[in-house]
Amino acid sequence: MNIDVLTLFPEMIEPVAAASMLGRASKNGILKIRAVNIRDFTQNKHKKTDDTPFGGGAGMVMSAQPVFDALRSVDAQDKRILYMSPRGRKLDRDLVTDLAAEENLVILCGHYEGIAQRFIDECVD
């Protein structure tokens, strides 16, 4: 299984991926986890990834552009794309069993008040 994790904090993913059962699965070639830093795909000199919501409202959301570009970098075609958010489906045993059958996953870690809805509508499974 190959898992690409799109995140603003890749330094948090790498130690977890190397520890315990995940680490053993990686060493045995069963699992490959790659952390992708969304900030690497911003088009401004300050590596800014947040913006105000398009329709207005409180808080900031992750800008669609760097997330779209990060997703393109992992060749997400034929990969199931998950967005981790408290608004979505609960991650329970049934969902984990379903996901374990996938060959390739992309996990997008949310931040701020969420992510631009345009990205969710176009890309998330």
Report the location of each language-model feature.
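A general secondary-structure boundary signal
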Residues: 2, 103-104, 125
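S-adenosyl-L-methionine/SAH cofactor-binding core of RNA-modifying enzymes
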Residues: 61-111, 116-117
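Structured adenosyl-cofactor binding patch, chiefly the S-adenosyl-L-methionine
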Residues: 115, 119-125
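Short, solvent-exposed amphipathic alpha-helical segments in soluble enzyme
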Residues: 20-24, 97-100, 122-123
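Conserved beta-strand scaffold positions in the cores of enzyme catalytic domains, especially
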Residues: 33-35, 81-83, 125
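Generic recognition of short, well-ordered alpha-helical segments
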Residues: 16-20, 94, 118
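N-terminal nucleotide/polyanion-binding subdomain common to many enzyme families
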Residues: 1-74
